Amino acid sequence: MEDDRAQVDLGIAADIDEMNPPPPPSVQQKQPKKRFLGRQSAAAGKSSSSSSNSTSQPAGANTSIEDSGAIQVAQPRRAPRMLNQVPDSILHDAALNEAIALLPSNYSFEIHKTIHRIRTLDAKRVALQMPEGLLLFATTISDILTQFCPGIETLIMGDVTYGACCIDDYTARAMGCDLLVHYAHSCLIPVDVTKIKTLYVFVDISIDTSHLLATLERNFAPGKSIAMVGTIQFNATIHGVRSTLQKAGYEVIIPQIAPLSKGEILGCTSPNLSQFLTSSGKQVDMILYLGDGRFHLESIMIHNPSIPAYRYDPYSRKLTHETYGHEEMQDVRRSAIRQAKTAKKWGLILGSLGRQGNPNTLGLIEEKLKANGTPFVNFCLSEIFPGKLAMMSDVECWVQVACPRLSIDWGYAFPRPLLTPYEALIALEEKEDWGKGAYPMDYYGREGLGRTKPAAMEV
């Protein structure tokens, strides 16, 4: 996990003692500046100078820094204290490992860590939340946890989970759970923000990297520069194949949009690759997305319309060239913004599916509408459908603070303009249109509208 990612409370915490200050010199004289060297070099130098001083130099004689005892040997560090290290009694439990073998071997559900976490917290009711693609494993995971953590009760959360923004700690808390295990997404909502103790399990998926490498070498000539991205499940693979591809003659860049991990993208958040140039100062030749489906890939394609994109599907083991209708999408979004500027009444939707909705972003738009004297009405919806919004025919423009891709992908299906927060601020003349550049996809970036802080609401 990268340094700038929201910190997870299940990592390795190091508790390092501070080094003791050196003892004061016995002779009051101006001391040379201390030099810090590697332990081996410093020890050798100190030993040599001690031997030399004892045989050839009188006390108080002028000496060089190396001979004056100014070399300070670094104190050996105490080994880090592993606060959450899974004990061997769990790792080597034969019965537990036999039960884990029922799950796919290339899927890392981190059962050992989960059991250790449950026991450490003395949790009694554990909520399990995962996307629909993993629900077929939910009952097996539940059975394993209840068998090896006697006395606990598990609750499988069956509501739709589209992404990391859908983590539902509110419902888990309301159901009396004291631990939420969220599978297959990264820590978009930090664990110090969630309302109950939370464990993120990325579900790292191992794939046949030899086929991936052979496919790339067959289709792309050495010397090409590649920006490699993917979902969190394949993040380890992306970093693992980088050195091999570089040895084969490719220049590999793993871009980052903080606070996501390097190489990780979301359907609403991806890096602008103009900030990640090659060693020769040029733009990368291509985007390579590792994963199934197009939803996340389209994010980085929208953000970087001039760079060709390819997708390697690790399940079908196929490499495909992907395209996107940038002009059509941008025309549709600009049309919606133009219509919104003449709307006499607005409707503001706060998404209530997990943590999708940001009340601070909603408040920011409210303040702008109040300043303009534009009437509006607030709604709270877990999912947004055209038929439901059509029932409020007096509302001439909608803004949904939930998922930007809902407006981008499906906005044309709604009877009235359905804007993202970014588009709403353009319509209210608080932000500039993207012009001839790329439509921004930075919703959960560090300064994105998905992370609006209360201070940003001040007018």
Swiss-Prot record:
It catalyses: L-histidyl-[translation elongation factor 2] + S-adenosyl-L-methionine = 2-[(3S)-amino-3-carboxypropyl]-L-histidyl-[translation elongation factor 2] + S-methyl-5'-thioadenosine + H(+). [4Fe-4S] cluster binds at residues 165, 268, 403. Its EC number is 2.5.1.108. One of its GO terms (cellular component) is cytoplasm. Pathway: Protein modification; peptidyl-diphthamide biosynthesis. It is found in: Cytoplasm. Residues 1-68 are annotated as: Disordered. This is 2-(3-amino-3-carboxypropyl)histidine synthase subunit 1. It comes from Neurospora crassa (strain ATCC 24698 / 74-OR23-1A / CBS 708.71 / DSM 1257 / FGSC 987).
